[in-house]
Every structure is written in C-alpha cells, then in structure tokens.
Amino acid sequence: LKYMLATQMAAPNSPQWFNTGLNYKYDLTGPQQGFWYVDPKTGNLTPGEDSYSRPQPHACFIQSIDDDLVNEGGIMDLWVKEARLFKFGSGTGTNFSNLRGEGEQLSGGGVSSGVMSFLKIGDRAAGAIKSGGTTRRAAKMVILDLDHPDIEDFIEWKAIEEDKARALIAAGYPADFNGEAYATVSGQNSNNSVKVPTEFLKAIEEDGDWDLIARTDGSVMKTVKARDLWNKIADACLLYTSDAADDLLC
C-alpha cells in the first residue's frame, strides 16, 4: 500500500488525506464532535474519544430524515449532522420524500410550506460551510421521489435560479461562480436527483397520467401527464446544469 501511494498508482478518498493519521503522527485530538465507532473487541457502538483518534475516513454518507421540524432525526437536526460531516471533509445525501408537500395539513393547524422551503435552508447552510469549512467545499446530494407533490418545483428549482443569475449578470454583476450573482440565488450547493420508478417509464410509453401523492394521507394532490413531467426533467438537465450526470439524475 505504501508503494502504491508513493508511486501514485492509487490514492485514498479526500477524507483519508484530511483526517487519517493526524492523531498518530502529530498527536492531534480536538473536541469530541458526535463521532461514534464500533469497538472491535466488544462489538458495541461507542462514543469516540476525540475528533482524530478514530477519524472520519469515509467520503459519502446517506442520511434519513423524518417529517418533523425540530426533534432528533427531523429537518433541523439534519442540518447539524450535515455540518458535522462537511467540517471533516465528507459528503452527504438524503431523500427528502418523507417531507409533506406544500399545502398539506399540519398536526397543529395550518398547512406546510413544502419541501422546497427547507431545501433552500439546507442549501444556504452548505454554502456557508463551503466558504468556511476546514477541509473542502461542502458536497451534498438531494433526492426527491417522482410522485412527491412538490416534484415540479424541485425539477425547475435550479433552472429558475439560473435565470435569476443570468439576469443579474446581464445587469453587470460578476459572472464567476463565486461572484455576487451566484451567491445571491439558491440551489447552487447540491446535486439534485429524482427517483424514477418503472411505473413512470411505462406511463411515458403509454402517454399516461402520473399522480402526485400527499405524504400525510396518500391522497392524490395533483395529476400530470407523465411525458410533460419527463420533458421538464430533460429540459432542466439540458439547459441549466453543468453536467446532466450530476444534476437531476434519472
């Protein structure tokens, strides 16, 4: 392994370079920041001693989210977990399809503001860590099922924000990615993906309808043409993303 690394025949992922061996070589520790490990002797899940004795070596994490605002496992808790991963150089991805769509009823009365309002909060948080993180820019993936009530807004999110950025650039703001135009708009800090089931592809072939389903009671909130929705995905990938393999994956 040493020979392969020294001759550049192979290389570990970024968090390995950032974190592995810092305690062994330089006696770095740092505060315990929520790290856990499986003790090889007991098999028990155990809190880590500090940040670097048992470091964070993995590049990617998949996290779940509950349809809850402030409790553990909910929306705001996810931003804290993402920040912890970003700080030590890892990326994270989450399917947000559990969150209710815009207009769905809340248990305490009123209606939900929808998944997009919370995605924009997470996008801003990632953007801040991208600028001030200790290792590299934040990297995250956002996934939404194709039957989510807010799927159309999700598909067009980056396209609309890109139009805003172009308008600002045309007005004289700098066009570089770190400039004021792109810092002003949202949706710039994640790869967005849609989860496409086989049933949807069959609906495209048959020119059929596609139902958007409420998360609270399973009722149909809206029905769209499958081909129209598919064309929105294609347009967003073709016209407004830097790499269709990275954004709005199908």
Regions found by a protein language model. Give the residues of each.
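N-terminal low-complexity segments that are often proline-rich with Ser/Thr-Pro
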Residues: 248-250
